[in-house]
């Protein structure tokens, strides 16, 4: 795609029509370069058309769509329960957050009650997912700025979280563990001990990361004062998540629009004031500490609740227990029809939003009364947050683009869908 075509898609970006152009009266000559779509710092398949005056960024045009998979359209041909597996593959670094947003929207359509044990388990697992996602961000962000040790340390702890996910669901990343009405399976033996072991070591590990970076003069030089954005511009651009909270706006859906009983948990919303790369780093580091605290509270609640149902008792939604399937022909028929034909929510629409590691993630579903959704749309935070990149990049060096992209933490599977 040419620069002119990209400019036509976004008229706010004044890109020149040629690779180089003569300087007009009173301005300097600029040059247009492609960054990506195969550049390692773009954290996926992202192309940036960068207009430069020397090494100074005049403007940036993100060119997306290289990872488009048609997930939203594909979901229209799946039953509601089968479509869960597709939600894993949008933001593939936080699949449980996508599972949660989707199943909450379907449960709204159905008016479904979820057992308390399943709700608490959802909170615990999505907070572990938040930590795992932030560890990927921290490691790759540090690696982009030549801090390799942090990358290795962060992935060390992420492995422990992925081991927990594997214990629970059998999969390390594409878990598909949340189901409409509850969970796919009950929490296994050894889950409590595995989570407790991780929560014991994680605060000390965060201290290690901060000791390596927070007061590091090279890290400060590459992040402080770079890519700053104020709260007014952030809100106007639709920025959410750590990027918005780094501007001083304490907006977190877990507090402002609670779901899954988050209003009953004790945690703070970390904020900063300058809105630059360094503040976005500080906010995410503080968020990991808060997530550890939420996990501790949720784990204690699971202990207090004890064994119990993990799926709704509504047999129009939930499959019969396996013990019944082996004894009852009616249960076997019901199981077969539920997975082949699916349940049928009433006509209507529903929206469910959650606070994913990258910001506000919402799922909007339209039901026509059939067993398959008429329309599914994701409000993907990576997609919306990416439009703030030109605003943050103007006036900085081209080398700062690498750090800027990392500070937004985009996942291109979620951007392109």
Curated annotation (Swiss-Prot):
EC code(s) of this entry: 7.1.1.-
Domain of life: Bacteria
Keyword Transport: yes
Gene3D superfamilies: Cytochrome-c3 Hydrogenase, chain B
Keywords: Cell membrane, Membrane, NAD, Quinone, Translocase, Transport, Ubiquinone
InterPro entries in alphabetical order: NADH_Q_OxRdtase_suD, NADH_UbQ_OxRdtase_49kDa_CS, NDH1_su_D/H, NiFe-Hase_large
Membrane topology of this protein: Peripheral membrane protein
Oligomer status and interactors: NDH-1 is composed of 14 different subunits. Subunits NuoB, C, D, E, F, and G constitute the peripheral sector of the complex.
NCBIfam families: NuoD, PRK06075.1
Family in the record: Belongs to the complex I 49 kDa subunit family.
Protein name: NADH-quinone oxidoreductase subunit D 2
Organism: Roseiflexus sp. (strain RS-1)
Phylogenetic placement of the source organism: Bacteria, Bacillati, Chloroflexota, Chloroflexia, Chloroflexales
């Amino acid at each position: 795609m040419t620069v002119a075509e990209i400019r036509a898609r976004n008229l706010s970006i004044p890109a020149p029509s040629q690779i180089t152009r003569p300087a007009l009266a009173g301005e300097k000559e600029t040059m247009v370069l492609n960054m990506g779509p195969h550049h390692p710092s773009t954290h996926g398949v992202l192309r940036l058309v960068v207009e430069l005056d020397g090494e100074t960024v005049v403007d940036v045009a993100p060119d997306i769509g290289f990872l488009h998979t048609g997930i939203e359209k594909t979901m229209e041909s799946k039953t509601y329960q089968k479509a869960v597996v597709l939600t894993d593959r949008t933001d593939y670094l936080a699949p449980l957050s996508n599972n949660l947003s989707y199943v909450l929207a379907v449960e709204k359509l159905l008016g479904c009650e979820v057992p308390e044990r399943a709700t608490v388990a959802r909170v615990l697992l999505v907070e572990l997912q938040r930590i795992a996602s932030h560890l990927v961000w921290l490691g790759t962000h540090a690696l982009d700025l030549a801090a390799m040790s942090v990358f290795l340390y962060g992935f060390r702890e992420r492995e422990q979280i992925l081991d927990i996910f594997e214990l629970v669901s059998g999969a390390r990343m594409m878990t598909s563990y949340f189901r409409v009405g509850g969970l796919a399976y009950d929490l296994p033996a050894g889950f409590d001990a595995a989570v407790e072991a991780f929560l014991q070591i994680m605060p000390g590990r965060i201290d290690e990361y901060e000791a390596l970076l927070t007061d590091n003069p090279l890290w400060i030089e590459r992040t402080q004062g770079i890519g700053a954005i104020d709260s007014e511009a952030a809100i106007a651009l639709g920025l959410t998540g750590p990027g918005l909270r780094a501007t001083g706006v304490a907006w977190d859906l877990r507090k402002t629009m609670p779901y899954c009983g988050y209003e009953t948990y004790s945690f703070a919303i970390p904020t900063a004031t300058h809105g630059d790369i360094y503040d976005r780093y500080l906010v995410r580091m503080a968020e990991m500490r808060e997530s550890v605290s939420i996990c501790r509270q949720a784990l204690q609640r699971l202990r207090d609740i004890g064994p119990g149902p993990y799926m709704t008792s509504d047999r129009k939604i939930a499959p019969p227990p396996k013990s019944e399937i082996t004894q009852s022909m009616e249960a076997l028929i019901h199981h077969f029809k539920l997975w082949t034909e699916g349940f049928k929510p009433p006509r209507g629409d529903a929206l469910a939003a959650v606070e994913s590691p990258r910001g506000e993630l919402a799922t909007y579903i339209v039901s026509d009364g059939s067993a398959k959704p008429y329309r599914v749309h994701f409000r993907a935070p990576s997609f919306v947050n990416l439009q703030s990149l030109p605003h943050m990049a103007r006036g900085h060096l081209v080398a700062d683009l690498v750090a800027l992209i990392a500070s937004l933490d985009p996942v291109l599977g979620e951007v392109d869908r």
